């Protein structure tokens, strides 16, 4: 491992709205039973491969917090320091939050749907303050005036990377194994940075739920293996394909 620590990225287990194929964003939904099982299994994988975290970073959303708790429990690491920040939250999907992905695709067309869902710099329409799935009155975001009203991936990069550089990198430089339990788009933002992916290439990156992704970093914090290594590669490939297919109408 050398003087630089190891970074482990973990997307939360399947959420209730993942299962229902809804845009979630900052809406605070829980895990399905499948998602809880994924979280437990992720901790088992960490223990089996002797990749035990020294510190955990996660978001302010329960699907990530619960995943982190279950993973640490199954890896017998509940005692490690836990640091939470809104900067690790999922991308805010604006007015799309709560909408069915397949219905949204059918209504607006493939091109607009994919631009909102996967492009680097196209945000969805703004969510209306005070609406059902808005966070403007949520006390956890009082210090940031309720948070954003929409975001594209570039916005997530802008809010997450300074936190990574100013806070998380310090633990990596200290030789710690750092576990980040977050969300599909906040992790895509970080992977884009780590792997120097272009704005075009990041469009095709899909991160599966509940499978740890290991990055060994050199002294310059560059990945030893570009793209990292999933602890369960077969499950990761299947999970990424499932994420890519979201938006398809269910039979």
Swiss-Prot record:
Binding site residues for substrate? 11-18, 24-25, 63, 90-93, 101, 117-118, 184-185
Active site at 12 (tele-phosphohistidine intermediate), 90 (proton donor/acceptor)
The record's InterPro entries line, in alphabetical order, gives: His_Pase_superF_clade-1, His_PPase_superfam, PG/BPGM_mutase_AS, Phosphogly_mut1
The coiled-coil segments of this chain are: none
Site features described as Transition state stabilizer, chain residue numbers: 183
The biological processes this protein is annotated with in GO are: gluconeogenesis; glycolytic process
Catalytic activity, EC: 5.4.2.11
Q: Which GO terms describe its molecular function?
A: phosphoglycerate mutase activity
The protein's superkingdom reads Bacteria
Physiological role: Catalyzes the interconversion of 2-phosphoglycerate and 3-phosphoglycerate.
HAMAP family linked: PGAM_GpmA (MF_01039)
Per the record, the similarity remark reads: Belongs to the phosphoglycerate mutase family. BPG-dependent PGAM subfamily.
**Name under which the protein is recorded:** 2,3-bisphosphoglycerate-dependent phosphoglycerate mutase
UniProt source species? Mycobacterium marinum (strain ATCC BAA-535 / M)
């Amino acid at each position: 491992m050398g003087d630089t620590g190891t970074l482990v990225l973990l997307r939360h287990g399947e959420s209730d709205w993942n299962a229902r194929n809804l845009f979630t964003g900052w809406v605070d939904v829980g895990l399905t039973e499948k998602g809880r099982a994924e979280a437990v299994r992720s901790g088992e994988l960490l223990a089996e491969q002797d990749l035990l975290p020294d510190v955990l970073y996660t978001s302010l959303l329960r699907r990530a917090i619960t995943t982190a708790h279950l993973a640490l429990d199954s890896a017998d690491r509940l005692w490690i320091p836990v640091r939470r920040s809104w900067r690790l939250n999922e991308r805010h999907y604006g007015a799309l939050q709560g909408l069915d992905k397949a219905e949204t695709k059918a209504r607006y067309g493939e091109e607009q749907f994919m631009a909102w869902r996967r492009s680097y710099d196209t945000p969805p329409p703004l969510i209306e303050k005070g609406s059902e799935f808005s966070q403007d009155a949520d006390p956890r975001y009082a210090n940031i005036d309720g948070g954003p009203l929409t975001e594209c991936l570039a916005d997530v990069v802008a809010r997450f990377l300074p936190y990574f550089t100013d806070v998380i990198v310090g633990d990596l430089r200290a030789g710690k194994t750092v576990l980040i339990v977050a969300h599909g788009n906040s992790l895509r933002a970080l992977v884009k940075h780590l792997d120097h992916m272009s704005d075009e290439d990041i469009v095709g990156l899909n991160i599966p739920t509940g499978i740890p992704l290991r990055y060994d970093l050199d002294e310059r914090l560059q990945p030893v293996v570009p793209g990292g290594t999933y602890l369960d590669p077969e499950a990761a490939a299947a999970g990424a394909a499932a994420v890519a297919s979201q938006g398809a109408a269910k039979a």
